[in-house]
């Protein structure tokens, strides 16, 4: 009958085994690191990448847009026209300058005519009103023609310039009232100086 080992010895043997296992594991880990470090080649600082993405560039693929029907033909015609115009404009700069100025003047004239409440349409309307008054007064003699023409011009001017017509009417009324009041008031008679016609004494 064999005698069992004491418990203290058993615990010490287990501790030694665990220590040996950890030592072997540490040797394996350190040996792998040393071999890997030995295989790497040293590089210069200038060769190090600034960003991590430099080592793995992204592959990009651009898909060209398919042209529409007749797009290439129109593009060819447009490019040819532009080239011809540039060539002609370079040789005839005076003609190009004149064409540009004419285009600007035509644009300004069109904008002026199409804009509302400009002087030209108003002048045309006032002229038409005066001509209508003149035609209506043909059978009334010179005074009648002058009167109807003046009435036609004044009527169309009042329609075209309503604010100014109101101001003129107010001013005329004020002057008329002042003239009427002045006419109604009789002037103050001056003191009559009697002349002494008796002979001197």
Swiss-Prot record:
It comes from the Eukaryota. The chain crosses the membrane at residues 118-138, 146-166. It holds the Pfam family ApoO. InterPro entries: MIC26/MIC27, MIC26/MIC27_animal. The keyword Transmembrane helix applies. GO terms for biological process: cristae formation. Residues 139-145 are mitochondrial intermembrane. Residues 32-117, 167-201 are cytoplasmic. GO terms for cellular component: MICOS complex; mitochondrial outer membrane. Disruption phenotype: Abnormal mitochondrial morphology with localized swellings and tubular extensions, and distended cristae. Double knockout with fzo-1 or eat-3 RNAi results in mitochondrial fragmentation. Double knockout with chch-3 results in reduced or no brood, poor growth and withered gonads which on a cellular level contain fewer mitochondria. It is a multi-pass membrane protein. The keyword Nucleus does not apply. Keywords: Membrane, Mitochondrion, Mitochondrion outer membrane, Transit peptide, Transmembrane, Transmembrane helix. Coiled coil: none annotated. It is found in: Mitochondrion outer membrane. Residues 1-31 form a transit peptide. Component of the mitochondrial contact site and cristae organizing system (MICOS) complex. Belongs to the apolipoprotein O/MICOS complex subunit Mic27 family. Sustains mitochondrial morphology probably through maintaining cristae morphology. May act as a component of the MICOS complex, a large protein complex of the mitochondria. This is MICOS complex subunit MIC27. It comes from Caenorhabditis elegans.
């Amino acid at each position: 009958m064999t005698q069992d080992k004491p418990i203290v010895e058993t615990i010490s043997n287990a501790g030694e085994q665990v220590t040996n296992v950890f030592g072997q594991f540490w040797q394996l880990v350190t040996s792998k690191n040393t071999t890997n470090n030995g295989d790497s080649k040293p590089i210069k600082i200038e060769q190090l990448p600034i960003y991590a993405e430099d080592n793995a560039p992204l592959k990009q693929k651009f898909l060209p847009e398919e042209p529409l029907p007749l797009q290439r033909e129109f593009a060819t015609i447009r490019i040819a026209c532009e080239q011809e115009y540039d060539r002609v404009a370079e040789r005839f700069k005076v003609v190009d300058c004149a064409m540009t100025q004419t285009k600007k003047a035509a644009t300004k004239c069109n904008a002026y005519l199409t804009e509302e409440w400009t002087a030209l349409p108003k002048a045309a309307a006032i002229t038409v009103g005066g001509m209508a008054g003149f035609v209506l007064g043909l059978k009334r003699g010179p005074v009648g023609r002058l009167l109807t023409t003046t009435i036609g011009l004044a009527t169309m001017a009042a329609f075209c310039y309503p604010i100014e017509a109101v101001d003129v009417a107010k001013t005329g009324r004020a002057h008329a009232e002042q003239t009427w009041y002045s006419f109604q008031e009789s002037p103050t008679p001056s003191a009559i100086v009697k002349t002494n016609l008796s002979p001197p004494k």
